Amino acid sequence: MQMWFSQYHTVNVKLDVRIQEQLFSGQSDYQKIDVFKSYEFGKMVALDGEIVFSDTDEFIYDEMVTHVPMAVHPNAKRILIIGGGDGGVAKELIKYPSVEHIDVVETDKMFVDVCRRFFPEVACGLEDERISMFYDDGLRFLRRKHDEYDLIINDSTDPLGHTEGLFTKEFYGSCYKALKDDGIMVYQHGSPFYDEDELECRKMHRKVYKSFPISRVYQAHIPTCPSGYWLFGFASKKYHPLYDLDAKRWDELGLKTWYYTTHLHRGAFMLPKYVEDLLEEEETK
């Protein structure tokens, strides 16, 4: 008997993944957590029935939210990760010897424990001595911060349920206040391909565009994400993601990556026409 995991992307489209076995299933105070071993994607974790990452593609997301801003900011020392309980973003950040301190704010302790158990090669990022872990609501944590971080990475899940507050105008305003004068914020921007997802992308871009003087969007191909096409947001008080990219400095670090390069960095901001159009429409409202 074959076992399949199904995730609906719309009422008319779903992704089916053939499963070898279910490794874990549990209900935390915030969400249902499942871990599967699949034939195609290796181990993968799902929250409330939606794939968060898998063995085969987590490196794409984690590298793109980390190395894009780090190749632009000349000296990011203090960093905040909101979400990030799997440890993947922290794993990439601790590659930088210049990083002095990283705060990780995660709501769900069970999710962290599950990732440490089943994805130790990812969660190892949380074990570095520069990491401080907080189990708290991201927005509540941010309200207490002012002029503190060089970089904020919003690594939360979709804008629903207990993470909904991390996609509001207040949240982006709080990020702005928590950043230093030349700070950068990076966040997942979702997929613009399906109509319902496009609406969320539009709303998100409109809020960030009004909150930061520099707001750009970039892209990556992530197979387990809805439509396989994923956007990220880059918002900054000072630095432009292309004009201020210091490719020579980043390349000389010699960091090992599987997806990100400084050549790809430039190309990631070259968006399809339909995506450019929908973003520009929101900028004129």
Curated annotation (Swiss-Prot):
Q: Name one GO molecular function term.
A: spermidine synthase activity
List, alphabetically, the SUPFAM superfamilies matched.
Answer: S-adenosyl-L-methionine-dependent methyltransferases
Q: In which pathway does it act?
A: Amine and polyamine biosynthesis; spermidine biosynthesis; spermidine from putrescine: step 1/1
Q: Which top EC class is given?
A: transferase
Q: Which residues form the active site?
A: 155 (proton acceptor)
- Which top-level group of life is the source organism from? Bacteria
Where does the PABS domain start and stop, copy by copy? 2-237
The EC number on file is: 2.5.1.16
Query: Which catalytic reaction applies to this protein?
Result: S-adenosyl 3-(methylsulfanyl)propylamine + putrescine = S-methyl-5'-thioadenosine + spermidine + H(+)
Q: Which GO terms describe its biological process?
A: spermidine biosynthetic process
Q: Where does spermidine bind?
A: 86, 155-158
Q: Which GO terms describe its cellular component?
A: cytosol
Keyword Ligase included in the entry's annotation: no
Keywords from the UniProt entry: Cytoplasm, Polyamine biosynthesis, Spermidine biosynthesis, Transferase
**Residues noted as binding S-methyl-5'-thioadenosine in the record, renumbered to the chain:** 31, 106, 137-138
Which PANTHER family does this UniProt record tie to the protein? SPERMIDINE SYNTHASE (PTHR11558:SF11), SPERMIDINE/SPERMINE SYNTHASE (PTHR11558)
Q: What is the documented function of this protein? A: Catalyzes the irreversible transfer of a propylamine group from the amino donor S-adenosylmethioninamine (decarboxy-AdoMet) to putrescine (1,4-diaminobutane) to yield spermidine.
Homology family: Belongs to the spermidine/spermine synthase family.
Question: What is known about its subunit structure?
Answer: Homodimer or homotetramer.
What is the name attached to this protein's record? Polyamine aminopropyltransferase
Q: Which organism's genome codes for this protein?
A: Agathobacter rectalis (strain ATCC 33656 / DSM 3377 / JCM 17463 / KCTC 5835 / VPI 0990) (Eubacterium rectale)
Gene designation per UniProt: speE
